[in-house]
C-alpha cells in the first residue's frame, strides 16, 4: 500500500543494508515511527545521497503492507538543523529515545511537534538541558505516565515546597524524611509540573527523575548515544 501524499518527517537512525541500500528508522507527523528500506541509497549516483540524514526536515513517501516499507520519495523540506557539539549528541539521544520507547506506526502529531520544537531549541542558544528535560516530560506524558507532581500520593495533601518527597514507581511522590537519590524537594516537583527548568538545581533534579521514570521503558540495555557522548566529551572541551 502506497501513501498518496508526502508526509513530513525526520530520519532517526540508519544502517547499511546489502551493498547499496539502507534501513532507515523514520519519525513522521502522521504515521509516527516506522522503518523503511531505501533501495540504492548508498549507490554513488543515488538521488538520496546526502538526503537521508538525521535532523533534516524531509518530505517522504513509501509503499508496502508489512512492517518493513519501501521508501519511494524523499526530499528536503528545509535545510538541516545546525546541531553542534553537545547539542548534536543530545539530538542523537532524543532520536534513540524515540526508537526505543514508542510503538511503530502509532500516530502522534503532538509528539512530532514536541520533537521538532526540541530540535529547534537544541539548534539555538536556548540551552541543551531545558530542551531535553521538556521533551522527556512530554514523552512520558505520551506514554501515559500520569504522576501527580502537585499532591502527596500518600496523604493527598498539596506538595509543600520545603518538604522532601520520595518517588515510587507507578505511585507518585510520598513525603519522606530520608534524603537520597530517589527523593526530591517539593519546590522541584512544582517546577516539574510547570515545566520550568530555568533553575540549574531543578534541571539536575529533573534529570534524575526522568532517568528513573524512563527506565521501565528502556530496560537494562544502555543507550548508545550516552556512550557516544562519554567517549567524545573530552574532544568537545
Curated annotation (Swiss-Prot):
GO terms for biological process: DNA recombination; double-strand break repair. Keywords: DNA damage, DNA recombination, DNA repair. GO terms for cellular component: bacterial nucleoid. The keyword Chaperone does not apply. It comes from the Bacteria. Involved in DNA repair and RecF pathway recombination. Belongs to the RecO family. HAMAP family: RecO (MF_00201). This is DNA repair protein RecO. The gene is recO.
